[in-house]
């Protein structure tokens, strides 16, 4: 058993496969995700886990060099993203999901609590 960090095996595997510039997303529980995109579903019930809880668990595990959010994303979600952010329409964000390596579905119920991240490099 792992001593620390992420425990979800699907999430650990998905992160380990990421390369520089690959995209992936953290989403609220209502975001429509394209059928061909891998979903790592962490949602238990409405509100658990929150977007913030999931993002805080991910931050020590991944290198991020950019992010995409939709117009209307709440300021508290924007503030959690510690990188350069591109703002697009909600429809454009949903279209970009088709290119993501995976989407992590949270139990978050805040509208527009969705962020696409661009993987960076650790060296």
From Swiss-Prot:
**Which biological process, per GO, is one annotated for this protein?**
D-ribose catabolic process
Which subcellular locations apply to this protein?
A: Cytoplasm
Identify the enzyme class: isomerase
The task this protein performs is described as:
Catalyzes the interconversion of beta-pyran and beta-furan forms of D-ribose.
Its main localization is cytoplasm
One GO cellular component this record assigns the protein to is: cytosol
Q: Which Gene3D superfamilies match?
A: RbsD-like domain
**Source species of the chain:** Corynebacterium glutamicum (strain R)
Please give the name of this protein: D-ribose pyranase
Q: Does the keyword Transport apply?
A: no
- Catalytic activity, as annotated: beta-D-ribopyranose = beta-D-ribofuranose
């Amino acid at each position: 058993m792992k001593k620390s960090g992420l425990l979800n095996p699907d999430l650990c595997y998905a992160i380990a496969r990421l390369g520089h510039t690959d995209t992936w997303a953290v989403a609220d529980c209502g975001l429509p995700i394209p059928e061909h995109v891998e979903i790592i579903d962490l949602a238990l019930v409405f509100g658990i886990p929150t977007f913030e809880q999931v993002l805080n668990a991910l931050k020590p595990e991944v290198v991020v060099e950019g992010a995409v959010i939709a117009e209307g994303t709440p300021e508290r979600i924007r503030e959690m993203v510690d990188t350069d952010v591109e703002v697009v329409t909600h429809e454009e964000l949903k279209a970009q999901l088709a290119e993501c390596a995976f989407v992590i579905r949270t139990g978050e119920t805040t509208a527009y609590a969705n962020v696409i991240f661009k993987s960076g490099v650790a060296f």
